[in-house]
Amino acid sequence: IAGFIVLRLRGILGKRTGFEGKTPAQFENILKKVHQEKKTKQNENFDAVAQKEFLKGAKIAYETIITDFSDNDNKLIASKPLLSKKIFDEFNKALVERGQRGHFAEITFIGISSADIKEHKKLDKVLNVTVNFVSEIITCIRDKEKKIISGSPDKIKTIYDTWTFSRDISSNNPNWLLVDTLN
């Protein structure tokens, strides 16, 4: 009986031979449009779920950029993909100046106390999101002789930063760039 059922199903459904043909072009175009519309709607909606996901990434970016800026190799290797050209140039200039003075940073990132979206604006196809960060950092700047110029190697300092991230929502690139900083 089972063999009979299998043969009947095979006769009705057929078997795959590899020569079935492709989906008709008219359906491919419809599928592409549906996927594109869904993608566009997801990019344009910056709802509570999107904001929560954004803040997760923003916290990681914040810590990465702060610790990379404190690295004394003056390369900003980890941060470069997260920074707009303007911000990268500003940070790089500050690092070069610090190096020319013979100063080096000792920064220990303790953690982020809070990160809240202050505002988000869509301008054409670009979404800008401004975030208020409150973090705890131990920071100390030393000179060539290792004398402390500023900060303390033992004191945790509360830092208040306001950073603006930007992303072209029409792009397939999911990365956000840091485009502005205020302290």
State where each predicted segment sits.
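Juxtamembrane and targeting peptides
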Residues: 1-64, 141-145
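Core segments of small alpha/beta cavity-forming domains
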Residues: 35-112, 116-118
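A composition-biased, non-transmembrane "mature-region" signal
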Residues: 5, 14, 45-65, 69, ...
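Structured, amphipathic secondary-structure segments that form assembly/contact surfaces
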Residues: 80-183
